[in-house]
Amino acid sequence: MDMKQMLKIELERAFKGTGFKISILIGMVISVLQFVKCVVPAAMNPLYVLKGRTIEIPSNINNIWMAMNPNVYYELYIRLLPIIVVIPYAITYYTDNKKGIVKNYYSRTKKINYIIAKYIAVFLTGGVTATIPLIINLMAASAVLPAIIAPIDSMPCNANGMWSYIYFTHPYIYYVMYLILQFICAGLLATISLIVSLYVNNAFIVLLFPAVLCEFMNAVTGWSHYRVVKGMAPWRMFSINQLAINYWQSYVLYILIILILGAVMYVWRGVKNDIV
């Protein structure tokens, strides 16, 4: 069995599994609630305005859809994201080893084929589950609300934030760019469970470790005097609205660190130390 066949098997297992459906359901419940509670009332009343701002403007897509409307729904979504991305498939490397399924694969293909295919499947499911609810919410809100490019003081995005110049001129390009970035970061976050799988002997630790790590990072990075380190707090990195400024250097560090850890602690050790 070559890499292409192995990858096909892993992707089918990942995207047809119950875990993937559960993650999408969790994200969609939050997305739909936000749409019903925030978007629909604004769409029902065209003269609705946002109160308490320096400049009041009619509600529109750029300050009402879930990712740009700072409220409990988006906050909950960000906090649950580390769990949402791992539920679909991140724990299966651990369970495959425990159930002996991996022995069947190793008898039919090279270890590296299985390990890389698993990594890609986990990465893709994590990215998809993190972005699909946001994309659907954006599309639904766009169907019922106007798209107004408003003055800086009336929009949630920090004027000094990353790509803010794009947001205040071409907001949809900004959304696409940030959703792609979120896809990558969420996918990599899910792969942390693969790394942990080689070092622990408990399924719940494998499942919950990314969430615990994110909360730990949220606390610890706040102690730093360096803005790039502060910017690596997950609650900031996954916040598209940038109420706290994001920095491109923080994303580069985040991506490089997880890629290096994945290459060394998962791929290299997986190939060397897995014993059939």
Feature-to-residue mapping (PLM):
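Aromatic- and glycine-rich beta-strand/loop motifs that create alpha-glucan
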Residues: 1-27
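Junction motif at the cytosolic side of a transmembrane helix
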Residues: 10, 255-276
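Membrane-helix interface segments
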Residues: 19, 110-112, 116, 202-205, ...
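Central hydrophobic cores of alpha-helical transmembrane segments
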Residues: 23-30, 203-217
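Secretory targeting signals
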Residues: 28-89, 119-190, 194, 198, ...
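Helix-loop-helix units of permease transmembrane domains in multi-pass membrane transporters
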Residues: 88-125
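Membrane-interface helix-boundary motifs at transmembrane edges
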Residues: 195-202, 270-275
